[in-house]
Design a protein with these regions (language model features):
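Nucleotide-activated donor-binding/catalytic signature segment of Leloir-type glycosyltransferases, i.e.
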Residues: 187-208
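Conserved acidic donor-binding segment of nucleotide-sugar-dependent glycosyltransferases
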Residues: 258-259, 263-270, 279-284
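Conserved donor-binding/catalytic core segment of Leloir-type glycosyltransferases
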Residues: 136-164, 176
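C-terminal alpha-helical cap of glycosyltransferases
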Residues: 303-330
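Membrane-proximal helix-turn-helix segments that form the acceptor-binding/catalytic region
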Residues: 61, 80-97, 111
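Short alpha-helical donor nucleotide-sugar binding micro-motif in glycosyltransferases
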Residues: 204-205, 212-217
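Carbohydrate-associated surface elements
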Residues: 103, 122
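Short hydrophobic beta-strand element within catalytic cores of glycosyltransferases
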Residues: 243-246
Length: 330
């Protein structure tokens, strides 16, 4: 890991991205490129920071193959601030462009027309599948897990409202909320007025403990309201063999299918969410079936498989010079 400036919090797509905006990093980056002579430079969101733009505009005698990956879906201000003409000037420096999903491809294509290869995100399946649950949550209660940053677009307030109703009918349930940030005013109001009980606010946790929370869950709920081009958190739940309840937003529908790996509810609809939760709380066999289906599907998202797709794409983009290898990738 080579530090490239102090990250600055920047609003992006309903979230906060931490990127380096220091133009003074360019000489350092160019010296690094010149010294290492990378065969491939792979940039994620290539126009989003001074670091990626500096790497994008660098070249030396035998120009390295430059690849950009786009994760953004609706909500990013970057593509509204700059015209397609300006963005195209920089995108033309890329030899290949990747989108992590069809929604991400559609979004970036609307701003920068071109050919995009869809290669999804991947995860380390093994570390989730082998994680051990926390003993304190193995007390017979049905554990419902929310995991994500406490941002409005993640939709936690809808889950809290649904759980508040559910808890009266099914007192042997527990809601575990994992993620950094602060609850919004509506979420605080729901907890204060309804006092549903058995709500665990775990805060931010380590990667190791995150796997254990998934292993402790009977149901994973992803109530996001939009601005998601993919759903890595769904992959993590599937790797943990956990039944999923997810909102029917476009990004999630690329990862799971209704009735196969997940029950999908109408986004922002508390009643629809509650009905899906009730089905799973009532039906252990259905939870098992969804969990097993998810565990099978997630195999295609193993990093080993995704990395193979990336290497194949790098090779396609390589020049006709057969002596040019792929030993050095940034």
């Amino acid at each position: 890991f080579i530090p490239m400036g102090r990250p600055v919090p920047v609003p992006s797509g309903g979230s906060i991205a931490r990127v380096s905006l220091s133009v003074w990093m360019r000489p350092k980056i160019w010296r690094l490129m010149e010294h290492e002579k990378f065969d491939v430079i792979h940039l994620h969101e290539p126009f989003a920071s001074a670091v990626t733009l500096s790497a994008l505009t660098f070249n030396y005698g035998d120009i390295p193959t430059k690849v950009g990956t786009y994760h953004t879906f609706n909500g990013s201000h970057l593509y509204k601030l700059f015209s397609s003409r300006i963005l195209r000037r920089y995108s033309d420096l890329l030899h290949g462009q990747i989108a992590v999903s069809e929604p991400a491809r559609a979004f970036i294509s609307a701003h920068i027309p071109g050919d995009y290869k869809v290669i999804p995100n991947g995860i380390d399946v093994k570390k989730f599948s082998e994680a051990s649950p926390f003993p304190r949550f193995s007390d017979g209660k049905t554990n419902i897990l929310f995991l994500g940053r406490l941002e409005k677009r993640k939709g936690l307030k809808y889950l809290l409202a649904a759980y508040s109703d559910l808890k009266w009918e099914f007192p042997n349930t527990r809601l575990i909320v994992v993620g950094g940030g602060n609850l919004d005013a509506e979420s605080m109001r729901i907890l204060g007025e309804r006092s549903p009980g058995d709500v665990i606010l775990a805060g931010a946790v380590s990667e190791f403990d995150k796997c254990r929370y998934f292993a402790s869950a009977d149901i994973f709920c992803a109530p996001a309201t939009g601005q998601e081009s993919f759903g890595i958190v769904l992959l993590e739940a599937m790797a943990s063999r956990t039944a999923i309840v997810a909102s029917d937003i476009v990004g999630f529908s690329q990862v799971v299918h209704e009735g196969r790996e997940a029950l999908m509810f109408k986004s922002r609809n508390v009643q629809s969410l509650k009905e899906s939760l009730v089905r799973l709380v009532n039906d252990k066999a259905l939870r098992s079936r969804l969990g097993n289906s998810g565990r099978t599907r997630v195999e295609q998202y193993r990093w080993e498989n995704i990395a193979a797709q990336l290497i194949d794409y790098y090779r396609i983009l390589q020049t006709a010079d057969s002596s040019k290898g792929l030993a050095n990738v940034l």
